[in-house]
Amino acid sequence: MSVADAMPETVDPGAASCPALFVAAPASGQGKTTVTAALARLHTRLGRRVRVFKCGPDFLDPQIHAVASGAPVHNVDLGMCGEADIARRLHAAAREADLILVEGVMGLYDGAPSGADIARRFGIPVDRKSVV
């Protein structure tokens, strides 16, 4: 499923499709920010346009990701931003980017909504082979 497939009806899906990956871990402090920033930097250096999103109301990690990707970073927080706003931002990113990275918060199944809930809601794949 692509990001465009998960858009609510209020968003015109248009022709937006882009590979996306949700970066998750079993708990906090496991290196999600480091891995996300490293992936963003690697793909940016390879000439790809990378857009990074951060789950939760975090304002420090997005600054790291903005430096790594060279692009603004937005939060994915349903309480703060709302589903329609997040969907619009993901859709806009899919139109202009070559890769979307979304960094989870805490463990994959921690919190309500959890990172797994967010990934499912917006159609962002989580590589289960990498999940420990």
How does the language model describe each region?
Residues 5-125, 130-132:
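ATP-dependent carboxylate-amine ligase catalytic core
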